[in-house]
Swiss-Prot record:
Keywords: Cytoplasmic vesicle, Disulfide bond, Glycoprotein, Golgi apparatus, Hydrolase, Membrane, Metal-binding, Metalloprotease, Phosphoprotein, Protease, Signal-anchor, Transmembrane, Transmembrane helix, Zinc. Residues 1-60 are cytoplasmic. Zn(2+) binds at residues 600, 604, 660. Converts big endothelin-1 to endothelin-1. Also involved in the processing of various neuroendocrine peptides, including neurotensin, angiotensin I, substance P, proenkephalin-derived peptides, and prodynorphin-derived peptides. May play a role in amyloid-beta processing. One of its GO terms (cellular component) is trans-Golgi network. Disulfide bonds join 92-97, 115-748, 123-708, 179-428, 637-760. This is Endothelin-converting enzyme 2.
Amino acid sequence: MNVALHELGGGGSMVEYKRAKLRDEESPEITVEGRATRDSLEVGFQKRTRQLFGSHTQLELVLAGLILVLAALLLGCLVALWVHRDPAHSTCVTEACIRVAGKILESLDRGVSPCQDFYQFSCGGWIRRNPLPNGRSRWNTFNSLWDQNQAILKHLLENTTFNSSSEAERKTRSFYLSCLQSERIEKLGAKPLRDLIDKIGGWNITGPWDEDSFMDVLKAVAGTYRATPFFTVYVSADSKSSNSNIIQVDQSGLFLPSRDYYLNRTANEKVLTAYLDYMVELGVLLGGQPTSTREQMQQVLELEIQLANITVPQDQRRDEEKIYHKMSISELQALAPAVDWLEFLSFLLSPLELGDSEPVVVYGTEYLQQVSELINRTEPSILNNYLIWNLVQKTTSSLDQRFETAQEKLLETLYGTKKSCTPRWQTCISNTDDALGFALGSLFVKATFDRQSKEIAEGMINEIRSAFEETLGDLVWMDEKTRLAAKEKADAIYDMIGFPDFILEPKELDDVYDGYEVSEDSFFQNMLNLYNFSAKVMADQLRKPPSRDQWSMTPQTVNAYYLPTKNEIVFPAGILQAPFYAHNHPKALNFGGIGVVMGHELTHAFDDQGREYDKEGNLRPWWQNESLTAFQNHTACMEEQYSQYQVNGERLNGLQTLGENIADNGGLKAAYNAYKAWLRKHGEEQPLPAVGLTNHQLFFVGFAQVWCSVRTPESSHEGLVTDPHSPARFRVLGTLSNSRDFLRHFGCPVGSPMNPGQLCEVW
């Protein structure tokens, strides 16, 4: 799918919180588990005073009264001193604590009971104060933080004193500046793409074309310019032999976010109409005649609908053992003869020499077989139009404003966005991140990243890993052999924090982008050079073993991931910031924020897909049958639970989101257990002022407020049919309604919405 069609971010502000009085019910002084409270001290003092009074003279009573007053003053001083010294009975009044307390209070909705709807309780205030910005289909913590990171990068790249010893960093600035040259881009108009189409052999929609050029056009579009018509080809670690890279082929070729948009035509009629109008408008902008262009684009759309029909839904592709098929190129040729695979792959991976025996991993043999049949029965003119349309999709974001305006109309229908107000610089930062993300990351890390954060994050990961492994020991459904192997896998998980080391070594960084030519004069040509360069990088990887230095996210990215073939978890510098993490925030918030993210990624090693990989990152069956059956029974509970949730009357797909739901639930539990272990070692923290929450409760509020989010109905629908994650609301409600710790600390009775009675637990 075109990069520009991915979700757009935005900005907003927090709401001033009108304080509600929850303190009587949940004051840290009263609800702390098992400790003496201020009330109990007062009761004890009153009992002692009664014993002092009896039948005595007036003088004795006066003296006794004076003694009692003095004793009371002395005891008050002692109590005050004790409270001051004991952090569990004092309040944190540092500037950081006051600021974060204010933000938490602004986000809360105290008009809602936490046992009724914890998401609304935690995020209601935030939602009221954060309407969707224009041009955005969703707005959340991740978008806000990415906006902040982009502003930092803008400052770094536009600094007039910019001076770097790294050629890669200089290329990054040149690329960014070329993207900002709106006047030149407008002056060139559609000419750069029209010239490229003519160079490839023409397009039936805009002029003459070579009728015998299917393979040549396929090689150019999918090879030189890295579009993905019909299928996608890439080089990556072999899932069953993770120490080596291998050619991999998978299904692809749809422009809209999901096959559902093509096949459920009644529900998506507006989207399909808007998509066809978009196709026609771009065809006309490139020189086509309106009537002829509409007729031919309708044929291309019908071809995409046929592709959607044979595309396997994501929820049916979760078992990689079943969809992984290793074969030779000659076997692939027999499976899908419409493409000359040796010719195509040899071109794609030039200058490597490939033979018929070269191994290839195919994900979805049935799809490739059917797509081959579809190619063979489709008219050459339609095939040509479809191939060039894929090239057009790939490149129009580098053209003038007319193409962007056409896309905005499609985005409004598809995602519910209004006219975009995204400034050009922000678009250019995103493009630069896509093209030279690690060179950009070098600038970002040197300007912003605190090395101490990396050390603290390392410590947190180890604490969360230990907590997860303790949970393994408590599982009654897992046999000892599988349990031991699971613990070994958890021990072997490799963590990467902040950034790969090579980005701070100028020569190593320059080597990564060696061969990529960048000019400040032509943004379009820079993008073409990037596609060609990425194809060469892919070819270079095939004969090399996978490297841990190859990250799948840039350092400035606000996200994290687990990679099963390396058995590694990665946390870029971009996410190691508030509200996920801050060194001067309470540990309850850090464990509830970045700690849950860490636990989430670690648990992915043991979700329904990650569990298929062993500690070395190889896809193989290492579970005993009885434990596997028990695991599947537990995950079935979670699948059914999430399938009951609805957004705007539309149900979640509990199977599609299963892996992420397992990770959310397991990550929360591991992070909370790690927080409890930290408290046992270091003692209670000072509570935040005014929030009226124990630190245990604060952990869960911190977790929930990370997911405060607003979204258009159209974007919500898109998420339900494409996203492996549950919607933000149910990432909170689903996870916490399965947490015994949450239910205990908030006292939610069985039968309340947050405590339906049946808990689904996997890890």
